[in-house]
Amino acid sequence: MAVSRSPVRRATSGWSTVTAALAVVVLVSGCGGETGGADGGTDPGSPPTGDPATGPGGGRNLTCGRSSFPPDATFYQDISGAALDPESHAIMAALDARNWGDPGDRQTLGIDFSFAVNCATTSVALRSYTQDGDNQPDCDLAPVPLPLGGKTEGSNDYACSGGDCHLLVYQATRLYELYQANVAGGLPTGGAFTGTCLAIWDLTRDYWGPTNHSPNYSRGDACDGGTAADLPIAPMLLTAEEVAAAVAGDGIIHHALRFTMTNNRLRSTGYVHPATHFAFGGTTGGADTLPTGARLRLRGDYNLAGLPSDAARVVARTLQHYGMYLVDGGNIYLSATTDAAAALNNAAVGALRPRDFEMVGGGRRIGQRDYECERTPVTN
């Protein structure tokens, strides 16, 4: 659903080209587990009893057998008591008056179950890709692991037939996120490997801490990436494993979620940290709309009893404690892995309206032309 491309580009003379063979490995797609339990047995407004699993931020964000990013990463911070953004009341009132979307667009908060997280062992060799478009120096140019049996967003393999086709791969201490990835014909006999923009994330690095400042904040202010906000996708996805663990445990997934927004409800210029880029090309929202990078929190007084399942209440309780980041334009959806559809459905949180949310105070506001992306792309 991305509409992101940087408004400022600097051309380069060519791309990095590295060739390597692919190795056969076991793929864990979605890194999923058991699904959530049935309704009943607990007070739907209170977290179920039980010990939470350990993990970053006191939670359970363990993907491909390891944690993603240091525990003080922005999406692991509990913001249930955080101050509101000064614009919160005006923006949320304006959004509520118009609803999540216009007639003809989606008008209720849904869940997009099209994402897949691919787990590559260190024995998987890397394969070079050819970049489509002129997205430099924003995008990384290093080769990418492609485990056999893997797939991109919205596909059953690595062949992209249209859409965003995000490729998400964990390998060792790196997370590779490639926008519009395509292996012609898929693997193992596929042809050319292409993609529009690659963001490589170092899982040991704190990109958003207090010592990080513009223009070198995160991967660089004004720098595009795998999604408009240039925030990592995989750590903020809903997964079946997390939902099941939360239903059986403390009732909360201990990280922020990500969501996309109808284009005319998304501010057309500027962004707020931790985002480092804004949705561009199709977004038309004015000053009373949400900026890219906004973090919304479900109101603490929202009555969870009316939600349809324990799994839906897990999502809502997570939104009360960790919120959801606005990462791109397109339509009004939370993002989830395909396996999470066994525990939830598209309408699980459809009762949540704009009036039920608040905009939490974020980081620095960045204007459309405050910076030009300045970074050295990763090439190996």
What are these regions (language model features)?
Residues S6-V18:
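N-terminal export and membrane-targeting signals
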Residues G50, G55-N380:
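Short, surface-exposed polybasic-aromatic patches that bind anionic ligands, especially phosphate groups
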Residues M1, S6-R9, V28-G58:
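Ser/Thr-rich, Pro/Gly/Ala-heavy low-complexity intrinsically disordered linkers and tails
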Residues T17-S29:
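Bacterial N-terminal signal peptides
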